[in-house]
Amino acid sequence: MAFNNTFKFAPAEWLPFQDTEVLDKVVNMDIRAHQGKNFENPDFELKVVFDVHNYFVVDLFQRIRLSDVKNEKLVVILPSPENAVFLSVVEALNKYKVSTRNVHVFFLYEYANEKGEVAPWQSPYSRSGHFIRYFYNRLDAELRMPMENIHFWTKENIETYSDEIEALGGADVVYTALSWSSGIGAIDPEGFPAKTTEEFLKMGSRLVTPMAEMIVHDSLRGMFGCSGDIANVPPRAVTVGPKDLMASKEWIDVEYLISCGGAIAQQKFPLQLAMFGPICPENPGSIMRLHKGTCYVCPEVATPGNTLPDYDILERIAEIRKKEENL
């Protein structure tokens, strides 16, 4: 019996980007073939590299080292948990006696509960707490930045977090990674509703309810047992806004997440949509193309998605046995 592909359907109604013509186009775009500075901002570059983690580590270490050598302030916006990165950077800082005294750290986003109460860094449910455990506490005491240089989220500073960053002259660098539907951390169209790109780019820090896909995704993290324990993931988050990303002097995006225990790169399509879809509020990741920076992509994410052909397992077994009999 012959099969055909006449079955059509629309994207799930809750998904922010609905243009099927664009979706069908970008899914076939080759990340590797579009490497380089081929985007709206000539200072934005797309690069496929074998060890994205290493590029992240080297970039952050070098910026901290220069802030020490030149005795200049360095303001960074960090995603967390990035424990492997934190450990590697700290090992180098300790080895070469590099001081972080001039470094100010802000966090891309943090968990909050249904009441809008922000997880304190001492909580096992805090993203920024991982920075303290795997970076600050492991750094030699004489090399540490003052605790007041670590700008934690609180319930009181949700609306003013962007102002705190701006008061220090904006971020010198922001590090990000894409989430589902081309979101940037907890920045997605639902939490940042805007009619125009211009309006979207002016939006600052706030309390949001992440997309359901983000809750499911986070349930696969080590801090939640890599188990799919959806009910154990805090339901809300506080996050910086597009305004803070665009005000940074440089933007480094890293795409190297794979599923726990597997090689399925869930960032493939979000990256394709961000790189090749329209720049608009419904496609948050696309705004990085307007900014100076680099998007580092691991080979697993850069490899096009694939669907294995369907087949009748009994027919396949019969074919194998027939070949064996003819040997």
Regions found by a protein language model. Name each.
Residues 2-22, 31, 36-56, 240-327:
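ATP/nucleoside-binding phosphotransfer catalytic cores, i.e., glycine-rich phosphate-binding loops
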Residues 18-44, 53-57, 98-175, 232, ...:
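Ligand-binding beta-strand-loop-alpha-helix segment within the catalytic cores
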Residues 59-72, 245-246:
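Glycine-rich phosphate/diphosphate-binding loops that line cofactor/substrate pockets in enzymes
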Residues 66-97:
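Glycine-rich N-terminal segment of FAD-binding domains in flavoprotein oxidoreductases
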Residues 76-86, 179-184, 259-260:
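Gly/Ser/Thr-rich loops at beta-strand to alpha-helix junctions
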Residues 89-100, 122, 189-200:
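A glycine- and small-aliphatic-rich helix-loop capping segment at beta-alpha/alpha-beta transitions
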Residues 181-234:
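Class I SAM-dependent methyltransferase SAM-binding "motif I" and its flanking Rossmann-like core
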Residues 230-239, 279:
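A general structural motif
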